[in-house]
């Protein structure tokens, strides 16, 4: 790891992803007296300063947040429950449900497809998803036979072109499903974003982390 990347022993590094999670984390940081001083949507920088010289933000893919925190490249981060369910919790402590970026993970099929009857008859379904581990566990518990097809985006396209019978994906308003003539048939789990902390950092930097974690907890409780 290059010296330019390394933080000082007293500095805290927060891992965030662009988009909804970043935007909805800003008020929580403000509650801790911290402002991110550059916008990741307009800046090319991946390491952003904050109003607190002892705290910096790194911008990573949403699915990579737990990895950066697990291996200590970040002291703490914000990740969706969907990401954490796929990644696992090794080396991580997740003390707070932040009550942000809420949605649900669901099974969806083309309108007119009799999902309940297909499952009842023991049909083997092709399911497109990027949440392979979570989907596998869900269908195994229900005794549903599936072939899982890993995709990284545009899940809705799978059933439309005959790649899959169903999809497992995140649903917020359901507008994308409706636009593609898909219907939600089964909710797997409610999703929100969690604060995740590196277990070693929690011990070694507790004095610096504790006030921020407390502020996050108070602010997120108001959102519940």
Swiss-Prot record:
Cellular component terms (Gene Ontology): cytoplasm
Keywords: Amino-acid biosynthesis, ATP-binding, Cytoplasm, Glycosyltransferase, Histidine biosynthesis, Nucleotide-binding, Transferase
UniProt keyword annotation of DNA damage present: no
PANTHER family: ATP PHOSPHORIBOSYLTRANSFERASE (PTHR21403:SF8), ATP PHOSPHORIBOSYLTRANSFERASE ATP-PRTASE (PTHR21403)
Role summary: Catalyzes the condensation of ATP and 5-phosphoribose 1-diphosphate to form N'-(5'-phosphoribosyl)-ATP (PR-ATP). Has a crucial role in the pathway because the rate of histidine biosynthesis seems to be controlled primarily by regulation of HisG enzymatic activity.
HAMAP family in the record: HisG_Short (MF_01018)
Protein name: ATP phosphoribosyltransferase
Species, as recorded: Cupriavidus metallidurans (strain ATCC 43123 / DSM 2839 / NBRC 102507 / CH34)
């Amino acid at each position: 790891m290059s010296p330019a990347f390394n933080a000082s022993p007293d500095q805290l590094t927060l891992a965030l992803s662009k988009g909804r999670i970043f935007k909805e984390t800003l008020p929580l940081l403000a509650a801790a007296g911290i402002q991110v001083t550059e916008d990741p949507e307009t800046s090319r920088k991946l390491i952003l300063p904050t109003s607190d010289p002892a705290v910096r933000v790194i911008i990573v893919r949403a699915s990579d947040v737990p990895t950066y925190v697990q291996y200590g490249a970040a002291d703490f981060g914000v990740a969706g429950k969907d990401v954490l369910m796929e990644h696992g919790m090794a080396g991580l402590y997740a003390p707070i449900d932040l009550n942000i970026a809420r949605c649900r993970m669901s099974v969806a099929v083309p309108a007119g497809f009799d999902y309940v009857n297909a499952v009842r008859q023991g049909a083997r379904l092709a399911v497109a998803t990027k949440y392979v581990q979570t989907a596998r566990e869900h269908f195994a518990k229900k005794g549903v036979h599936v072939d899982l097809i890993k995709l990284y985006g545009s899940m809705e396209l799978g059933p439309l072109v005959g790649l899959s019978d169903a999809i497992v994906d995140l649903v917020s308003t359901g507008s994308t499903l409706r636009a593609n003539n898909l219907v939600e048939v089964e909710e797997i789990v409610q999703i929100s974003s969690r604060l995740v902390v590196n277990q070693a950092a929690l011990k070694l930097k507790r004095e610096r982390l504790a006030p921020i974690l407390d502020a996050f907890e108070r602010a997120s409780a108001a959102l519940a």
